């Protein structure tokens, strides 16, 4: 998986000697959500996300399996789907949390459309409105986390999910970062959903 490589020096270049790669050094510095350890990754994910969507978990587990097998495009595709499902769940929570009937009708039409960008724009604008009117309602980085992860994964998923002349040049480092960011994305979504359950917007 690119974490270790045979040999420790010029005199001992082969097995049974081995050393950490630069990528491996990066991996061992992290304490949680290591995609190289799918079991603990999922356990840690379930510890911070209350009642995780079983469909999200299924795609996340598949993404982890693909990652450990070195199938980076497939891993990114599965993670992108998990990200999209998470966002659609947020859209449903947002719809239920809207207090204005005309705004609910407007957002329902957007939800029924195929445009993910339109959905995200509505949700983003509404969250910005909430944060402007209630300073402590949500964490300061809510928009940044949602925007960065959603846009990143959506773009990569589109790149790997549609036939094209040139294959996407995904690196293990890139996908590693995506996997590390995903739990925080889901945690941020959970915080927004929790707010919407008790506050009409």
Each PLM stretch: what is its role?
Residues 97-150, 196:
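Flexible secondary-structure boundary motifs
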Residues 60-92:
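Short, hydrophobic, well-ordered secondary-structure elements
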Residues 5-6, 93, 97:
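Short, flexible/disordered secondary-structure transition segments
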Residues 14, 46-53, 72-76, 113, ...:
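Amphipathic, non-membrane alpha-helical segments in soluble helical-bundle scaffolds
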Residues 2:
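Glycine-centered, phosphate/nucleic-acid-interacting loop/turn motifs that mediate DNA/RNA or nucleotide
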Residues 5-16, 135-201:
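Charge-enriched, short contiguous segments at helix-coil
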Residues 12-73, 180-181, 195-201:
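Charged alpha-helical initiation segments
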């Amino acid at each position: 998986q690119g974490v270790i490589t045979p040999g420790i020096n010029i005199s001992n270049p082969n097995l049974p000697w081995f050393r950490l790669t630069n990528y491996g050094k990066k991996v061992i510095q992290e304490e949680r959500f290591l995609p190289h350890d799918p079991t603990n990754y999922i356990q840690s994910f379930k510890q911070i996300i209350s009642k995780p969507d079983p469909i999200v978990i299924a795609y996340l587990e598949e993404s982890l399996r693909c990652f450990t097998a070195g199938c980076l495009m497939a891993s990114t595709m599965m993670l992108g789907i998990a990200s999209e499902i998470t966002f659609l769940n947020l859209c449903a929570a947002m719809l239920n949390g809207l207090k204005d009937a005309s705004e609910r009708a407007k957002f329902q039409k957007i939800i029924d459309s195929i445009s993910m960008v339109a959905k995200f724009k509505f949700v983003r604008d509404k969250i910005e409105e909430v944060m402007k009117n209630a300073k402590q309602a949500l964490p300061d980085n809510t928009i940044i986390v949602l925007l960065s992860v959603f846009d990143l994964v959506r773009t990569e998923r589109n790149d790997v999910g549609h036939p094209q002349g040139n294959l996407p040049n995904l690196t293990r480092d890139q996908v590693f970062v995506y996997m590390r960011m995903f739990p925080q994305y889901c945690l941020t979504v959970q915080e927004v959903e929790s707010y919407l359950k008790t506050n009409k917007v």
